[in-house]
């Protein structure tokens, strides 16, 4: 076990495959180049080895079967002794520690009053107090303690709130459900309430609590941790247990794992116990010990064992975040990004020279690569969620330079494959449930992050021009001319096409029902908002294409809702809870969209009179959506659905009244509205669009954008350019190294321009590609060619058939006859850059339209 002990204590010795591939347990270790034909145990005993994934001798003894790499042949590599000695002497003199680095980050972000990093947080907190917590004239609410989040609730909450914040920030339907979520803006609220003065608690003498626990007790609590913790996918159970057995385990990592386990394992629930807790089992003592171990850890040890350090940091950061300690959590997670970035660079650089080692037939390098990938996506998801709450843009990540998504299911997970091969299967079902949630979280994060940054970096010309001083306005105009890009009215169409392709991929590739339902609900909800995206200040007429797309989205959402009660129950209740809440928000968005469509519908247009069958179908959809809102499985979200039910009940009758008159007779809009209001006198929709509270904010108005308006009317239509922000803070937000040029420290992720127009097309399409023109992959596909004549025929087609709305739904029907056009590329390229305006105030949320329906019954 000596060779494996070195790997457990020093993960940098483990291999790094060029690309993760499917694991084949039938492949013998003798076929792997660079490995001994005999396992470590057989070579030590000098007995014949069967050379299987788990040899017969190790299987009989029920021990780990390890195949170590062969010794290098030839002369050893010459090393520069002078440079190495000089660097070692310099390192000994400076003796930097992890605690010093974390404390420096804490001071720069939250204590210091100068610098872009501190201004980023402090200005966001000030804007939050001004615009979110602004007391009403009627009363000043008393401050209430912010409720904490459990671990599984926080993990499930991330994806849901990212979608919700995107809709509230750039959607067209207001923010009625803002107050219905007690954890809304959890990060910025925790940051605004916190007054922690330092990164670490005052030092005190403390004996190691691990020695007093005993190995058997430690192993049992580790099993319990893998049973209950939602982040179990960032730790390999087999590698951790082997390190405990060999006494090479990272004490900080083990202490934080035991702290979480003992906190969940409450002996007070057992009536046969006295309820007393021994000091070595105190979660606070273990947590303090883990933080102290990391605080005094030399940075050289971090570089030698980066994976275990990153695991301890992300678990500590997650615990602090769930407790509402946002300051320390930001630093822990930020430094985790830095550690993962360095290891990612090192593994990419040394990919061809890495030695391979197998444990029970599984490549340890693939296991470590999966762990790093899972930690990376947790960091990215948390950072994206936090930056969206503080209303700041962030660096877009080039997809070909980031790790792959986490494993879609347990069959492709090297971590779980190793646990099965090692017979560590007691907590496997819980580990599978925890691992399955990382994939939809990563999918939603990557999608929402790009849409958020696109909208945030493509505001209206009016707001940005007025934001610049008069004596520099011409400089911004020249810069806009230099950075030509597509017309902003095309943005919704581009995003719509990309989301449709993402929906097609999810429907085709994802087999887990709960994951598929959550992703489809989230993306269809975004599409509903995009159809009425407030990109223009004046409302545009509703077109048959808008009616068609909205009808197909509602039909798909109804299909998903019909399947929700039959979905298998998740072992993590919070995941099912927030997935169901996402459906409630989706139904609320559909109700807003139907009311908006009715209020802006012009019956005097001939093409609108011809769309009467489509409106009848929408009325039926409104009726079915109203029935879904009354379902028992949505009963916990009455605060969201109560106004939605009122809107749906009203718009159902209003749309039917709109279609009662013969289409051959022109009917005025006022007559139709009066007919609808005759049945519901207490309900009369307002036609005034939402207004901006102050210049400079992106509109949350009610202007509906026709898809025809997305297409320039003439080849000479001038494209709109984007005015760059007034301030560009340090893009290396979490990095202290000049080579790390991005928010998360990964190389090559910060670019000088978020858009690059290389196409001569008059519409200046936005297409997503890499720097070398290659496609990003299945997730980021090319946008449709909106100048193609087939798209016009698609938009002019019959709104939608009269088939059952809860059957045969999917992206193909949303695409219409032009679905085949979604894969066309114009060759334009997509770059990224971190644009921040730290002085920009937090957006003032406009009130929703629920007040219109406050007196209307369900």
Swiss-Prot record:
Consequence of gene loss (knockout): Loses the ability to produce pyranterreones.
Subcellular localization(s) per the UniProt record: Nucleus
Segments of this protein annotated with the region Disordered: 1-35, 72-99
Predominant subcellular localization, coarse grouping: nucleus
Pfam families per UniProt: Fungal_trans, Zn_clus
Annotated protein name in UniProt: Transcription factor pytR
GO terms (BP aspect): DNA-templated transcription; positive regulation of metabolic process
Domain of life of the native organism: Eukaryota
PANTHER family linked to this entry: ZN(II)2CYS6 TRANSCRIPTION FACTOR (EUROFUNG) (PTHR47338:SF5), ZN(II)2CYS6 TRANSCRIPTION FACTOR (EUROFUNG)-RELATED (PTHR47338)
InterPro entries for the chain: TF_fung, Transcription_factor_dom_fun, Zn2-C6_fun-type_DNA-bd_sf, Zn2Cys6_DnaBD
Keyword field: DNA-binding, Metal-binding, Nucleus, Transcription, Transcription regulation, Zinc
DNA-binding region of this protein: 39-65
Listed CDD domains: fungal_TF_MHR (cd12148), GAL4 (cd00067)
Role, per record: Transcription factor that regulates the expression of the gene cluster that mediates the biosynthesis of Pyranterreones, a family of antioxidative compounds.
An annotated Gene Ontology molecular function: DNA-binding transcription factor activity, RNA polymerase II-specific
This protein's GO CC annotations: nucleus
């Amino acid at each position: 076990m000596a060779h494996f002990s070195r790997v457990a204590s020093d993960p940098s010795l483990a291999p790094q495959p060029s690309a993760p591939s499917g694991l084949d347990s039938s492949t013998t270790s003798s076929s792997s180049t660079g490995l001994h034909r005999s396992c470590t145990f057989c070579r030590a005993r000098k007995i014949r080895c069967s050379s299987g994934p788990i040899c017969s001798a190790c299987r009989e003894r029920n021990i780990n079967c390890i195949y170590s790499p062969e010794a290098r042949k030839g002369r050893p590599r010459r090393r520069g002794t002078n440079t190495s000695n000089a660097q070692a002497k310099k390192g000994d003199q400076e003796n930097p520690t992890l605690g010093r680095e974390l404390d420096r980050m804490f001071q720069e972000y939250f204590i210091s009053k100068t610098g872009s990093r501190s201004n980023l947080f402090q200005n966001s907190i000030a804007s939050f107090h001004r615009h979110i917590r602004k007391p009403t004239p009627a009363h000043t609410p008393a401050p209430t303690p912010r409720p904490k989040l459990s671990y599984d609730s926080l993990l499930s909450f991330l994806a849901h709130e990212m979608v919700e914040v995107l809709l509230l920030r750039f959607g067209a339907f207001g923010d009625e459900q803002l107050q219905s979520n007690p954890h809304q803006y959890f990060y910025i609220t925790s940051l605004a309430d916190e007054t922690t003065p330092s990164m670490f608690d005052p030092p005190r003498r403390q004996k190691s609590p691990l020695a007093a626990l005993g190995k058997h007790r430690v192993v049992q609590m580790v099993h319990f941790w893998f049973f209950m913790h939602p982040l179990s996918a960032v730790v390999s159970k087999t590698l951790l247990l082997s390190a405990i057995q060999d006494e090479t385990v990272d004490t900080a990592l083990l202490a934080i794992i035991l702290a979480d386990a003992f906190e969940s394992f409450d002996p007070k629930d057992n009536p046969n116990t006295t309820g007393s807790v021994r000091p070595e089992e105190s979660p606070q003592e273990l947590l303090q010990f883990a933080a102290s171990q990391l605080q005094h850890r030399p940075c050289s040890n971090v570089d030698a064992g980066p994976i275990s350090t990153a695991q301890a940091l992300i678990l500590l950061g997650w615990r602090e975040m769930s407790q509402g300690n946002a300051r320390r959590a930001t630093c822990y997670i930020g430094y985790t990004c830095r550690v993962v970035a360095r290891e990612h660079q090192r593994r990419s650089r040394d990919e061809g020279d890495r030695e391979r080692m197998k444990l029970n037939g599984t490549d340890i390098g693939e296991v470590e690569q999966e762990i790093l990938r899972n930690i990376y996506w947790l960091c990215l998801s948390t950072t994206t969620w936090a930056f969206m709450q503080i209303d700041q843009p962030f660096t877009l990540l080039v997809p070909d330079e980031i790790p792959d998504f986490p494993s879609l299911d347990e069959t492709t997970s090297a971590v779980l494959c190793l646990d099965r091969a090692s017979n560590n299967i007691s907590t496997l079902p819980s580990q599978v449930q925890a691992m399955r949630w990382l994939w939809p979280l990563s999918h939603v994060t990557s999608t929402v992050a790009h849409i958020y940054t696109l909208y945030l970096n493509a505001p209206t010309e009016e707001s940005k021009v007025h934001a610049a001083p008069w004596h520099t306005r011409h400089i911004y105009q020249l810069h806009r001319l230099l950075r030509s890009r597509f017309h902003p009215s095309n943005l919704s169409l581009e995003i719509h096409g990309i989301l449709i392709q993402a929906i097609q991929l999810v429907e085709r590739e994802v087999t887990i029902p709960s994951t598929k339902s959550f992703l489809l609900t989230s993306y269809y909800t975004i599409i509903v908002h995009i159809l009425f995206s407030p990109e223009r200040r004046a409302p545009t007429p509703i077109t048959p294409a808008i009616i068609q797309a909205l009808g197909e989205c509602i039909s798909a959402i109804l299909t998903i809702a019909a399947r929700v009660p039959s979905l298998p129950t998740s072992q993590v209740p919070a995941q099912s809870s927030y997935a169901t809440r996402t459906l409630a928000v989706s139904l609320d968005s559909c109700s807003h969209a139907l009311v908006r469509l009715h209020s802006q519908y012009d019956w005097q247009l001939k093409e609108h009179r011809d769309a009467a069958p489509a409106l009848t179908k929408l009325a039926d959809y409104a009726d079915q959506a109203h029935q879904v809102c009354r379902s028992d499985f949505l009963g916990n979200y009455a605060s969201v659905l109560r106004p939605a039910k009122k809107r749906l009940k009203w718009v159902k009758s209003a749309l039917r009244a709109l279609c009662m008159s013969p289409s051959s007779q022109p009917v005025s809009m006022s007559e139709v509205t009066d007919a609808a209001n005759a049945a519901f006198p207490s309900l009369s929709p307002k036609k005034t669009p939402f207004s901006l509270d102050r210049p400079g904010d992106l509109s949350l108005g009610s202007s509906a954008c026709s898809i025809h308006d997305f297409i320039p009317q003439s080849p000479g239509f001038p494209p709109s350019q984007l005015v760059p922000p007034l301030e560009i803070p340090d893009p290396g937000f979490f990095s202290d190294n000049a080579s790390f040029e991005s928010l998360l420290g990964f190389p090559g992720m910060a670019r000088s321009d978020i858009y690059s127009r290389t196409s001569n097309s008059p519409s200046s399409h936005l297409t997503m590609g890499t720097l070398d023109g290659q496609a990003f992959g299945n997730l980021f596909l090319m946008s449709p060619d909106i100048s193609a004549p087939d798209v016009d025929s698609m938009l002019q087609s019959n709104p939608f058939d009269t088939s059952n709305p809860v059957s045969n739904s999917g992206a193909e029907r949303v695409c219409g006859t032009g679905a085949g056009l979604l894969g066309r590329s114009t060759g334009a390229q997509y770059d990224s850059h971190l644009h921040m305006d730290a002085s920009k105030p937090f957006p003032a949320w406009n009130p929703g339209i629920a007040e219109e329906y406050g007196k209307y019954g369900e």
